[in-house]
């Protein structure tokens, strides 16, 4: 059994639903910095209280406080994706209206907005179960062009740059310095030196009941508007505009293969023959190198 604990400040509705929990420092039980944050916010009709949470990371989350701590553990880089149990986490998180004045309940939000408008313009960032990561955790050594594009529970390694059109879901992210201009779906990891090009997509495990975990190895390149539905080893390239799924027929070494049979292979370029239209895989002799100036964060 692996345990983790932290003290944080929780936001509760008048009916006791937990809207959020912020754990500023993993492992700390010091309440002194959080005490001034406790109290009632009548405009939002919520109460903020200090909580201390201890969990078994090998077991499934048991309540909302537990679920929030697991998301913090990922974004604080205490646990890598897939090394902490997140079974059933969706059912433990409440749908929340995320505003510039803090989280609000969905029920009755029209009146909540009216009360908050006395403080100034009310901006709604999203209505979702997951907030923006940077509102709770700002990892060292990363750049994020658009805070709305990275969910709490994302794991961003030192040296990662997420450009404005990049996206990183929870329980997913980068294991080393990487350029993210495309979408890293839930459950996906990309390793050191990999470049996810603009508009590129990596197939996740949430949609359609998918169970296969997709990962990209070191020094890979997904070209602009390409897609990847199989794990890649190191030094692989998918050319711009080409989407590789598990069932894609690929000409490799003189015969046709399902792309799934090449999963995890190192040193391949996947491209479409511009004359025949056939997807082919050939040995990669190129070396993908990131611009170090863009990753000295």
Swiss-Prot record:
Domain of life: Bacteria
One of the record's GO cellular component terms: cytoplasm
Any one GO BP annotation for this protein: diaminopimelate biosynthetic process
Enzyme class, spelled out: transferase
Binding-site list for succinyl-CoA: 183, 198, 201, 224, 239-240, 247, 258, 271-274
Active site feature: 181
Pathway in which the depicted protein is active: Amino-acid biosynthesis; L-lysine biosynthesis via DAP pathway; LL-2,6-diaminopimelate from (S)-tetrahydrodipicolinate (succinylase route): step 1/3
Binding site residues for Mg(2+) 2: 165
GO MF annotations, alphabetized: 2,3,4,5-tetrahydropyridine-2,6-dicarboxylate N-succinyltransferase activity; magnesium ion binding
EC number per UniProt: 2.3.1.117
Catalytic activity: (S)-2,3,4,5-tetrahydrodipicolinate + succinyl-CoA + H2O = (S)-2-succinylamino-6-oxoheptanedioate + CoA
UniProt KW keywords: Acyltransferase, Amino-acid biosynthesis, Cytoplasm, Diaminopimelate biosynthesis, Lysine biosynthesis, Magnesium, Metal-binding, Transferase
Subunit (UniProt): Homotrimer.
HAMAP family the UniProt entry points to: DapD_type2
Sequence similarity: Belongs to the type 2 tetrahydrodipicolinate N-succinyltransferase family.
Protein name per the record: 2,3,4,5-tetrahydropyridine-2,6-dicarboxylate N-succinyltransferase
